[in-house]
UniProtKB/Swiss-Prot annotation:
Substrate binds at R12, D13, S166, H193, Y284. It comes from the Bacteria. Its EC number is 4.1.3.39. It catalyses: (S)-4-hydroxy-2-oxopentanoate = acetaldehyde + pyruvate. It is an enzyme of class 4 (lyase). GO terms for biological process: catabolic process; L-leucine biosynthetic process. The keyword Manganese applies. Keywords: Aromatic hydrocarbons catabolism, Lyase, Manganese, Metal-binding. This is 4-hydroxy-2-oxovalerate aldolase. Residues 4-254 form the Pyruvate carboxyltransferase domain. The active site is at H16. One of its GO terms (molecular function) is 2-isopropylmalate synthase activity.
Length: 336
């Protein structure tokens, strides 16, 4: 196991948990703490990436561009990263983000749709950025299939491709198998992004590292979507115990989590019933509220809806299946 590069995504994935209400002061405080603790890359955007601030995804209290500028000014050593989802972020937003200090672009697609990212990788490379591919909902497809999708991203110019456990659905063996498949196929680096819906954020990250992952993600205090992410301070402590600390100040990260992030958190992400259901079913977290609403209307347990959606391997954008599945469950109940 080699010492990995850590990207802290408190100010991006954590935006979901904060309902996109980060302030300039929050960014200054968090970036300063992470930078002093030796974190090399800090991701800053709306939870759904550049241009994510919208009626559909939730409006940001402060614009991405202003937060990115604050981050760049606050960081003495760390590089500033941004997330971009094809179909949401465009060249205009990316160009503006680069002008304000973005140096690393992470381009995220569903794990079945790497082909839609070609233009975005080339655009980022033309702007001189380091590029990272994000294969979201990676648990949905086999290691071999993921490797093929990752190969596309590599061919478009990705410097690293991540296995992304968006739903927190993987077991350690799943994380290891997918990372290993990418390592066996790609020439570029491989990363792993964990969520904690089944309580396995740290365990899955360790399994990914043992399988050869070069880059990993964390959030201070685990602040992120669903049940949260692998906690940056925990990752630092574990890496140090394993003898592969990449230069992180463990105590400083513990203090950052406790004194900088914890006081501003609206709640502590935790594997509660809803979060466990998402991880157990293996569906995207945006399905939850829709399933609850439809379930209440039709008298169907929303967990049954989500589990069936997971069995059918639905991905983001297929929310219309929720009603169909609920109606099928009603018909089955009536026939019983």
């Amino acid at each position: 196991m080699n010492a990995p590069r850590l990207t802290d995504t408190t100010l991006r994935d954590g935006s979901h948990a904060m309902r996109h209400m980060f302030t300039r002061q929050h960014v200054r405080d968090i970036v300063t703490a992470l930078d002093r603790a030796g974190v090399p890359v800090i991701e800053v955007t709306h939870g759904d990436g550049l241009a994510g601030s919208s009626l559909q995804y939730g409006f940001s209290f402060v614009s991405d561009l202003d937060l990115i500028a604050e981050a760049r000014e606050s960081a003495e050593r760390a590089r500033i990263a941004a997330l971009l989802l094809p179909g949401i972020g465009t060249r205009r937003e990316l160009k503006a983000a680069v002008e304000r200090g973005v140096q690393v672009l992470r381009i995220a697609t569903q794990c079945t749709e790497a082909d839609i990212s070609e233009e975005h990788f080339k655009m980022a490379k033309d702007m001189g950025l380091e590029t990272v591919g994000f294969l979201m909902m990676s648990h949905m497809r086999s290691p071999e299939f993921l490797a093929e999708q990752a190969l596309l991203m590599e061919s478009y110019g990705a410097d690293c491709v991540y296995v992304v456990d968006s739903a927190g659905a993987m077991l350690p063996r799943d994380a290891a198998a997918r990372v290993r498949a990418l390592k066996d196929t790609l020439r570029v680096q491989v990363g792993f992004h964990a969520h904690n819906n089944l309580g396995l954020g740290i365990g899955n990250t360790l399994a990914a590292l043992e399988a050869g992952a070069d880059q990993i993600d964390g959030c201070l205090r685990g602040l992120g979507a669903g049940a949260g992410n692998a906690a940056t301070e925990l990752l630092a402590a574990v890496l140090d115990r394993l003898g592969v600390n990449p230069g992180l100040d463990v105590l400083a990260l513990m203090d950052a989590a406790e004194y900088v992030v914890a006081p501003i958190m609206p709640f502590q992400p935790f594997p509660d019933r809803d979060a466990i259901t998402i991880g157990y079913a293996g569906v995207y977290s945006t399905f939850l509220l829709h399933a609850k609403r439809v379930g209440e209307q039709l008298g169907v347990d929303p967990r049954a809806i989500l589990i069936e959606l997971g069995r059918r391997q639905t991905v983001a954008g297929q929310e219309d299946w929720i009603l169909d599945v609920a109606l099928e469950l009603v018909r089955k109940r009536e026939r019983a």
